[in-house]
A protein has these predicted regions:
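Small-residue-biased structural context
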Residues: 2-197
């Protein structure tokens, strides 16, 4: 009497069955070194906030595109975006970055000119955001001060400034922070951020 053949497990191939046991991948970072290369939680959180803000800027830009085509944008959506942008990033996000930048200058005096530029950019972005929010409110209400050209220019100025600013932070300042700040610096920055939240 012959024994019944067992069918191979579905989805497996000869190569999969003969693969070596799982172990560290070639080029994988050992666990002991992984923490040294991973961004600190603060940088990760700031990056997540930037990604969310970038999505909102895309939404805003689509509405401005309608204005460029002489169509009526969704003023309520634009207002919602800018209400958020002038409440959360301006009041909570930028002050957290300022704490990181302050520590960078303490560790690397050569970064001071760039940090001053970024701190001034925070002030400028806040002003541009308020100007844009006002222009959107006029459009929403349809009042005599509503001017699509003013709104379009204000939106382009705000979107362009904020995108450039976030790019500088991602490409230069966040990597520099990871390079020069110590573990104790990150703990201090984190503790000082708590009241902001």
């Amino acid at each position: 009497m012959s024994t019944p053949r067992t069918a191979p497990m579905s989805g497996t191939s000869r190569r999969a069955r003969s693969a070596p046991p799982l172990g560290p991948r070639r080029g994988a970072v050992p666990a002991s070194e992984a923490t040294a290369t991973e961004p600190p939680d603060i940088i990760r959180a700031l990056g997540d906030e930037h990604r969310y803000q970038a999505r909102l800027l895309n939404l805003l830009e689509r509405q401005v595109g309608l204005l460029n085509q002489r169509q009526v944008p969704d003023y309520d959506a634009m207002y919602g975006v800018m209400r958020y942008m002038t409440q959360f990033p301006d009041r909570l996000h930028h002050p957290k970055e300022d704490l990181v930048f302050e520590k960078i200058v303490q560790r690397d005096a050569g970064a001071e000119p760039k940090v001053k530029e970024l701190l001034q950019a925070h002030v400028d972005i806040i002003e541009k955001g308020q100007h844009l929010l006002e222009a959107i409110e006029h459009g929403r209400k349809g009042d005599a001060q509503a001017d699509p050209n003013v709104l379009r220019k204000a939106a382009h100025a705000y979107i362009g400034s904020l995108r450039r600013h976030m790019d500088i932070e991602h490409l230069h300042m966040f990597p520099l922070a990871q390079k020069v700040l110590t573990a104790a610096d990150w703990v201090e920055v984190d503790a000082r951020m708590k009241p902001i939240l």
